[in-house]
């Protein structure tokens, strides 16, 4: 509850992102707004939730790749927000090579990362036991069961399976979604036509673009 996702999407990513507390895009029919709202920014609730928690005398170490200025800005904003709620946390900016090495060693408390999800929003690689992107080593039978149920759910049960999985992830927080990035092409009004962007490639069909004088 200590992260203001809207300010990160609007300021750190210059409106090129959609804030959400769920690992599912808000435009998806699987998205549950009430669940996302339940994890929305609320510093007071974070303070209450941290009462009696032991976070270590040295505070938390938060890693970010120093080679991406937008991510550094977002990470700093997160640090400022958590610090404002009383969390002792420091930001460590690392080169991509050092950042990846630290993740592989598990030498971190928190880290900011970008992940390209598959179209079905399968999170097995992120939070499944022995998942290839599960750098935190999260291993939980309930999570694995919910992931399996989500993958196996037919059309009628898929929404409820997604809700159960997202509710579990909010309660346990092995990952904390921030936003989904948007791709964009900036051009003068009316100068460019024929754009045909697809997922992960705003320049799809570049050879068919028409630039008007």
Show which residues each predicted segment covers.
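Ligand/substrate-recognition segments at binding pockets and active sites
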Residues: 51-117
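Extended ligand-binding regions for polar small-molecule ligands
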Residues: 1-10, 141-159
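Structural transition elements
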Residues: 2, 14-52, 68-73
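Solvent-exposed loop/turn segments at secondary-structure junctions
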Residues: 5-8, 15-19, 28-31, 67-70, ...
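Periplasmic-binding protein-like
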Residues: 1-28, 166-174, 179
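Bilobed periplasmic-binding protein-like "clamshell/Venus-flytrap" ligand-binding domains
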Residues: 10, 52-66, 111-114, 153-189
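Small-molecule-sensing regulatory modules
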Residues: 59, 72-77, 84, 124, ...
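Short, solvent-exposed loop/beta-turn-alpha elements that line the ligand-binding surface or hinge
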Residues: 29-46, 102-106, 124-151, 180-213
């Amino acid at each position: 509850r200590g992260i203001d996702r809207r300010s990160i999407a609007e300021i750190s990513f210059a409106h090129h992102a959609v804030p959400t507390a769920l690992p599912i895009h808000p435009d998806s029919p699987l998205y549950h707004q009430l669940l996302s709202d339940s994890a929305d920014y609320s510093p007071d609730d974070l303070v209450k939730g941290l009462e009696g928690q032991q976070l270590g005398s040295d505070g938390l170490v938060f890693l970010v790749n120093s080679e991406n200025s937008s991510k550094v800005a977002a990470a700093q904003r997160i640090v400022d927000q958590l610090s404002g709620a009383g969390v002792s946390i420091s930001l460590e900016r690392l080169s991509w090579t050092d950042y990846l090495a630290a993740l592989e060693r598990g030498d971190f408390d928190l880290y900011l990362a970008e992940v390209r999800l598959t179209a079905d929003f399968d999170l097995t690689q992120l939070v499944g036991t022995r998942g290839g992107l599960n750098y935190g080593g999260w291993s939980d039978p309930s999570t694995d069961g919910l992931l399996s149920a989500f993958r196996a759910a037919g059309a009628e049960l898929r929404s409820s399976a997604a809700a159960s999985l997202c509710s579990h992830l909010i309660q346990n927080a092995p990952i904390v979604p921030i936003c989904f990035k948007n791709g964009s092409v900036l051009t003068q009004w009316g100068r460019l036509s024929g754009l045909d962007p697809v997922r992960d490639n705003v320049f799809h069909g570049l050879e068919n673009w028409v630039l008007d004088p």
